[in-house]
């Protein structure tokens, strides 16, 4: 999942998966202490529920003890789980805010994207909003503004404000990921940690749809068709001027307004069949 995130411009922290204690020690020394130790199992969705996460591990000795305790705890609490080792992740010292970004595909309605307060906050406070891909930065900001955590992200009780433009870009990148892969049934990034203004994806989960996407349709899993890039073309005028012809976008409104200000009253009247005052 983290490889997907990096490909779509969603920042993550240094992470590696280790199949043994020796591999875990090697990973930890390469990444650098302190680290977070997590169980790696496809059968465990919420690691905290089985005590599968240790934070603040700052030495080889602490890692050895944590590794042994983690394996014993898992054998006791979920003995049938398939264990693929552990995940070693560089620890972020101070987390100011936690966010969640998720998506789920409904067979009739299509894919929808969720944004809101992350960590345990998504279950306790249920502060989230829903949007439909594709999302641009304007729609991403509107998605953020519909949540209560948006006010906190602007600075709260001495905490640094989050880089809202970066979070917009993360949402847009996530939307592009969901658009490109109809095979994804559900996905969530939880939490997205905001530290000193910058956001990082700490954990991600992907569930694949076992059914084949509908044939003959470019985006069978979306209720809104993405921007038709196939109609974008470049042309040369007689004087050699290069022009770009493309379908209009919502964010073109300021440019359209600017164009209207250059037109005469007669041109506007012939275009709209009545005077345009504003």
Model-derived features with residue positions:
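ATP-dependent carboxylate/acyl-activation modules
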Residues: 1-275
């Amino acid at each position: 999942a983290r490889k997907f995130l990096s490909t779509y411009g969603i920042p993550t922290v240094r992470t590696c998966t280790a199949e043994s204690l020796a591999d875990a020690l090697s990973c930890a020394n390469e990444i650098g202490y302190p680290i977070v130790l997590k169980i790696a199992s496809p059968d465990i969705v919420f690691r905290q529920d089985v005590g599968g996460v240790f934070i603040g591990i700052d030495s080889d000795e602490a890692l050895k003890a944590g590794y042994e305790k983690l394996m014993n705890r898992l054998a006791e609490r979920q003995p049938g789980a398939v264990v693929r080792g552990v995940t070693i992740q560089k620890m972020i010292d101070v987390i100011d805010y936690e966010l969640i970004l998720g998506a789920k595909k409904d067979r009739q309605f299509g894919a929808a994207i969720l944004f809101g307060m992350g960590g345990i906050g998504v279950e306790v406070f249920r502060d989230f909003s829903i949007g439909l891909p594709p999302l641009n930065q304007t729609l991403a900001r509107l998605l953020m503004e519909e949540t209560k955590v948006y006010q906190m992200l602007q600075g709260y009780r001495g905490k640094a404000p989050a880089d809202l433009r970066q979070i917009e870009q993360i949402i847009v990148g996530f939307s592009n990921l969901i658009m490109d892969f109809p095979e994804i049934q559900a996905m969530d990034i939880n939490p997205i940690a905001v530290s000193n203004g910058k956001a990082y994806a700490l954990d991600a989960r992907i569930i694949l749809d076992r059914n084949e996407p509908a044939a003959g349709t470019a985006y069978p899993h979306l209720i809104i068709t993405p921007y038709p890039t196939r109609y974008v073309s470049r042309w040369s005028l007689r004087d050699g001027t290069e022009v770009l012809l493309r379908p209009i976008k919502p964010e073109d409104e300021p440019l359209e307004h600017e164009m209207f200000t250059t037109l005469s009253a007669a041109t506007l009247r012939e275009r709209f069949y009545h005077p345009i005052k504003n």
